[in-house]
From Swiss-Prot:
Compartment(s) of residence: Cell inner membrane
Biological function: Produces ATP from ADP in the presence of a proton gradient across the membrane.
Protein name: ATP synthase epsilon chain
Disulfide pairings: none
Matches recorded under Pfam families: ATP-synt_DE, ATP-synt_DE_N
Amino acid sequence: MSIMEVEVVSSEQKIYSGEATFIVVPTVQGELGIYPRHEPIMSLVRPGALRLTVPGEDKEVLVAVSGGVLEVQPDKVTVLADVAVRSAEMDQARAEEAKKAAEAGISQAKDDKALAEAHKALAAAIAQLKTLDYIRSHKK
């Protein structure tokens, strides 16, 4: 079985660092599936569910990413995410409330900094909601 190293890092912390046999990353071009020995590429990440297939694990490792940059090398994948949250740390009600608060923040922003922060919060909430939707739709 071929493996690659994967690093998922947010601006606050390292979310995942380890091996994977397959990774799906939501990019601006669509979902990108990456196996070991993939051609080198770079892409922008869009809000959504990043999915990792880890050797020895029965379930995928899911991480909500709100945007960022993806770098793929033949033996390593790095995702530098604006905001990233593991699925175990997500809650539907909190994510919906965060989305509403971010939307209100966008409409009430008094300056560019407040607007940018509200957009970042909205992207993070949307990413979590998309990841939770993925989990619900793929329950066995």
